[in-house]
Amino acid sequence: MAVGNPLGLAGTVTTGIVSALNRPVTTSDAQTDPTQQTTSDPVVTNAIQTSAAINPGNSGGALVNASGQLIGINSAIASLGSSNGSSSQSGNIGIGFAIPVNEARSIASQLITSGKATHPYLGVASKDGVVADGSAKRAAAVLTNVVSGTPADKAGLQAGDAIVGVDGNSIDGSLSLVAQVRERTVGDKVTITVLRDGQRRDLEVTLIAKPATTP
């Protein structure tokens, strides 16, 4: 059930199902080209997709299960004018997104403790690509830039590497890479699997707090 104030109608409750989990969704202020991403681009990390009606005014409201337990925070809708999940003035078409409660709780805790939220930073830019993986081909996030001195650089990541996994989770493009990084916390050690020169390599990266300014 989604609770909120759609179109100014306070206390509205709508029902639906969880349509999908771990759905990387670009927020409305992300850069124009969704195939060119950096790990500091704004996204909803691995969002919950729901069929419960979500409309403008629902953002920030609760998404709860049948027992009344909070499972997410309503955040965005897909519209006919926007295929990347960003909110718009269009109405609900049965595809809404919510930030998972665990991520929302982590951010809220940081805001209460320090007055600000920190986000993990890898230090790469990537694009969607299709690369050879043995005798097959697969989708991946292909690095277009690795910023000097960042966790990615220190771990040995290079421009041209095709990232296909993070901690065993499959990466099929730039958005899924960004979402996986955003799901972590500052200080986490993550194993990044890349394809380089036709060979798989596992590199360990320690994520740092996102700098105030990034290249």
Model-found features: residue ranges?
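C-terminal recognition in membrane/secretory proteostasis and scaffolding
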Residues: 52, 66-67, 79-82, 93-96, ...
